[in-house]
């Protein structure tokens, strides 16, 4: 388990290499958790920057779960019912956003509120199941295991 630095916008060019070196562990990871502040107005741009950075360091092919945090702080501007102008991203509800991202990512994302502990159990279950996929204990097929099993069941 490793935690990297949070999103840094407009990082000075002199620090880019040292910033990327802190992400070296990403290349060794089995699973990435990309936590996004969904209440930030530029969260989609931040996702793109992180994805580009992951590709730049060779981690773009890693399995990734996108975790949208701060759903309790998400806001939108409600349109009047008779307003026929097209919706902008400021008018999209959280439910509409969930459907959009779920469709884009084949449900490899989760919407949570760490502060309010909303959907935390779902996050734990998702992580448990995903980690279990990567770390299944396997035993070689041989008579030795059957002998141990027989000894245990005959007692």
Regions inferred by a protein language model and the residue ranges of each:
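Switch I (G2) and immediately adjacent beta-strands of P-loop GTPase domains
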Residues: 1-10, 31
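Walker B catalytic acidic pair
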Residues: 4, 38, 70
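A conditional alpha-helix N-cap/helix-loop micro-motif detector
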Residues: 12-15, 47
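Inter-motif core of Ras-like GTPase G domains
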Residues: 15-40, 52-60
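C-terminal-of-GTPase-core extension/linker across diverse P-loop GTPases
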Residues: 41-155
């Amino acid at each position: 388990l490793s935690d990297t630095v949070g999103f840094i916008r407009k990082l000075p060019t002199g620090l880019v290499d040292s910033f990327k070196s802190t992400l070296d562990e990403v290349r060794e990871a089995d699973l990435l958790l990309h936590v996004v502040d969904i209440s930030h107005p530029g969260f989609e741009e931040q996702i793109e920057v992180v994805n580009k950075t992951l590709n730049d360091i060779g981690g773009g092919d890693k399995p990734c779960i996108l975790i949208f945090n701060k759903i309790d702080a998400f806001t939108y501007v409600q349109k009047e019912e008779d307003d026929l102008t097209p919706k902008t991203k400021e008018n999209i509800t959280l439910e509409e956003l969930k459907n959009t991202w779920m469709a884009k990512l084949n449900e490899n994302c989760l919407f949570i509120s760490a502060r309010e502990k909303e959907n935390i159990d779902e996050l734990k279950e998702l992580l448990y199941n995903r980690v279990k996929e990567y770390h299944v204990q396997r035993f070689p097929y041989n008579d030795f295991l059957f002998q141990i099993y027989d000894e245990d069941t005959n007692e």
